[in-house]
């Protein structure tokens, strides 16, 4: 299991990490958009911003919510059109061990 990317923040400021977690729960809860759709949007954002680990973690969460590899591929296409080919490279790296 990979190291928690927030381990240092948790050590020096656990309150901010708790705030982040409660915000995450609020933002990604079902509403007008399903949790799955929100996670797919977040995958596209992280791919566009170069966050390989974010793509990986969010894609895993999206899959647990029922996302298919085809849906993930489509959100990476959107990220590519909106942000350039780097989003495909980042998405591919992030999905390396997630999609078989």
Predicted segments, located by residue:
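Acidic, glycine/proline-rich low-complexity segments that act as flexible tails and inter-domain linkers
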Residues: 1-37, 60-64, 90-100
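Residues within well-ordered alpha-helical secondary structure of globular protein domains
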Residues: 22, 44, 78-81
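Amphipathic, charged-and-aliphatic alpha-helical interface segments
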Residues: 38-52
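Buried hydrophobic packing segments
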Residues: 44-45, 58, 75, 95
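Short helix-capping/linker segments at secondary-structure and domain boundaries
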Residues: 49-56, 86-90
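Mid-chain, well-packed structural core segment of small domains
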Residues: 51-78
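C-terminal structural segments of small proteins and small subunits
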Residues: 71-98
């Amino acid at each position: 299991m990979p190291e928690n990317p927030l381990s240092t923040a948790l050590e020096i400021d656990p309150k901010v990490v708790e705030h982040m977690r409660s915000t995450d729960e609020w933002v990604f809860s079902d509403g007008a958009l399903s949790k799955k759709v929100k996670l797919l949007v977040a995958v596209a954002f992280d791919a566009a911003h170069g966050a390989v680990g974010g793509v990986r973690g969010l894609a895993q969460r999206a899959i647990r919510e029922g996302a298919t590899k085809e849906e993930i591929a489509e959100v990476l296409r959107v990220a590519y059109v909106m942000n350039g080919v780097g989003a495909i490279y980042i998405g591919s790296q992030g999905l390396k061990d997630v999609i078989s």
